[in-house]
């Protein structure tokens, strides 16, 4: 259980910006199409 935060925090720190970037790029692509 002690190793969980040291693995979980960088994982979330990498995954959340990746999801934000992906949704942002999809939003920009939709705006370019319409």
From Swiss-Prot:
<keyword id="KW-0812">Transmembrane</keyword>
<keyword id="KW-0793">Thylakoid</keyword>
<dbReference type="GO" id="GO:0009522">
    <property type="term" value="C:photosystem I"/>
</dbReference>
<dbReference type="Pfam" id="PF00796">
    <property type="entry name" value="PSI_8"/>
</dbReference>
<dbReference type="GO" id="GO:0015979">
    <property type="term" value="P:photosynthesis"/>
</dbReference>
<dbReference type="InterPro" id="IPR001302">
    <property type="entry name" value="PSI_PsaI"/>
</dbReference>
<comment type="function">
    <text>May help in the organization of the PsaL subunit.</text>
</comment>
<dbReference type="InterPro" id="IPR036357">
    <property type="entry name" value="PSI_PsaI_sf"/>
</dbReference>
<protein>
    <recommendedName>
        <fullName>Photosystem I reaction center subunit VIII</fullName>
    </recommendedName>
</protein>
<keyword id="KW-1133">Transmembrane helix</keyword>
<keyword id="KW-0150">Chloroplast</keyword>
<keyword id="KW-0934">Plastid</keyword>
<keyword id="KW-0472">Membrane</keyword>
<keyword id="KW-0603">Photosystem I</keyword>
<dbReference type="GO" id="GO:0009535">
    <property type="term" value="C:chloroplast thylakoid membrane"/>
</dbReference>
<comment type="similarity">
    <text>Belongs to the PsaI family.</text>
</comment>
<keyword id="KW-0602">Photosynthesis</keyword>
<feature type="transmembrane region" description="Helical">
    <location>
        <begin position="4"/>
        <end position="26"/>
    </location>
</feature>
């Amino acid at each position: 259980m002690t190793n969980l935060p040291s693995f979980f925090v960088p994982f979330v720190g990498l995954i959340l910006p990746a999801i934000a970037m992906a949704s942002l790029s999809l939003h920009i692509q939709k705006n370019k199409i319409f």
